[in-house]
Amino acid sequence: MESNCGHPMLSVSSAMYTFLLGAIFITLSSSRILLVKYSANEENKYDYLPTTVNVCSELVKLVFCALVSFWVLKKEDHQNRKLRCGSWKEFFNFMKWSIPAFLYFLDNLIVFYVLSYLQPAMAVIFSNFSIITTALLFRIVLKRHLNGIQWASLLILFLSIVALTSGTETSQHSLAGHGFHHDALFSPSNSCLLFRSECPRKDNCTAKEWTFSEAQWNTTARVFSHIRLGLGHVLIIVQCFISSMANIYNEKILKEGNQLTESIFVQNSKLYFFGVLFNGLTLGLQSGNRDQIKNCGIFYGHNAFSVALIFVTAFQGLSVAFILKFLDNMFHVLMAQVTTVVITTVSVLVFDFRPSLEFFLEAPSVLLSILIYNASNPQGVENVPRKERIRDLSGTLWERSSGDGEELERLTKPKSDIESDEDTF
């Protein structure tokens, strides 16, 4: 009985940490979407290379995690010795991190394209499609069971998104004319004047690379004209698949085997090493990027918003890593839906986003299907995520372990021998 006395306090502490982590993620995610939009110029294009934002944010995360990792490994000599003794198995385990790094690289790059064609509110609403992709990949990759109510809510969600898509008429030409943000965006640079003088003949060579030909896309997508499908809609569906795959694979390798007890900063150092590598290769391999960096430097075209975007993107990536390590993908998806509400509200107030009557009728269907999905989650798959959370938190923060009924009793009994607990998991 005495061993259970502290559990209510630990449960409150765990709930506080969970709430704080969710609030941080929502704030950073909302800020990131708004900063991407604010960092564009009057033509809704980017005067800087978007890849430079991703390179710098990955570098910020790598430096931060590497410094913390060195401090952690210094305190744990046995892990330090293990790292010195390399083997092929450890090398292949290290190379595993290249897969989510590449997927995150694609995900971060597509965001710039999406927000060139869609309002932030519409982009976030359509990104709810990630619930479907996450659920499917949960079932296939993580073998997670979904009950009938959850599948029904996913079907309602999908149909609501299709209806929402067919009922919106957002013109990409009108995007640059919203609000008052254009005048304060661009900070002209004094460098590379010669390079800039050649750009007008090439139709703004910096910004041109980051938009698609509208005429070419319209002829390609004419078959979808009856549902008013645009390039932004297709891109965001692709982004949902890529983002879901990245997060699920990342959660899998964060928690599988002995990775569960490894420091999250050591794990993230491996991930961000490949993130810097992939984004850096993109800068070097594209001739347009190479010429601009050679003549103007890597920070040409950046403004206050894009610089802030670098750090917000970095810390948002860190918050996602903490969610996947200590919670799970479904919590991440749920917090993304709260971000939807925040971005929609801000778009109405700042970007002069004026929802139609159809929007007000169909958007609640999206949010209600999300609510039904998450409300049915404890009834259908309670045991699996609960066990994962307990396993995950018990590997690092033993005092934050939580559970209900027999499950908690079973986990707290062998508390005198923590290592045997790990072996059974």
From Swiss-Prot:
Its main location: Golgi. Residues 398-425 are annotated as: Disordered. GO terms for molecular function: antiporter activity; pyrimidine nucleotide-sugar transmembrane transporter activity; transmembrane transporter activity. The modification Phosphoserine is found at S394, S416, S420. The keyword Transport applies. The keyword Glycoprotein applies. Keywords: Antiport, Glycoprotein, Golgi apparatus, Membrane, Phosphoprotein, Sugar transport, Transmembrane, Transmembrane helix, Transport. It catalyses: UMP(out) + UDP-alpha-D-glucuronate(in) = UMP(in) + UDP-alpha-D-glucuronate(out); UMP(out) + UDP-N-acetyl-alpha-D-glucosamine(in) = UMP(in) + UDP-N-acetyl-alpha-D-glucosamine(out); UDP-N-acetyl-alpha-D-galactosamine(in) + UMP(out) = UDP-N-acetyl-alpha-D-galactosamine(out) + UMP(in). It is a multi-pass membrane protein. Residues 1-7, 74-92, 143-147, 250-263, 325-330, 376-425 are cytoplasmic. One of its GO terms (biological process) is transmembrane transport. InterPro entries: Nuc_sug_transpt. It is found in: Golgi apparatus membrane. The chain crosses the membrane at residues 8-28, 53-73, 93-115, 120-142, 148-168, 229-249, 264-284, 304-324, 331-351, 355-375. Glycans are attached at N204, N218. GO terms for cellular component: Golgi membrane. Residues 29-52, 116-119, 169-228, 285-303, 352-354 are lumenal. Pfam families: Nuc_sug_transp. Probable UDP-sugar:UMP transmembrane antiporter involved in UDP-alpha-D-glucuronate/UDP-GlcA, UDP-GlcNAc/UDP-N-acetyl-alpha-D-glucosamine and UDP-N-acetyl-alpha-D-galactosamine/UDP-GalNAc transport from the cytosol to the lumen of the Golgi. Belongs to the nucleotide-sugar transporter family. SLC35A subfamily. NCBIfam families: nst. Probably forms homooligomers and heterooligomers with SLC35A1, SLC35A2, SLC35A3 and SLC35A4. This is UDP-sugar transporter protein SLC35A5.
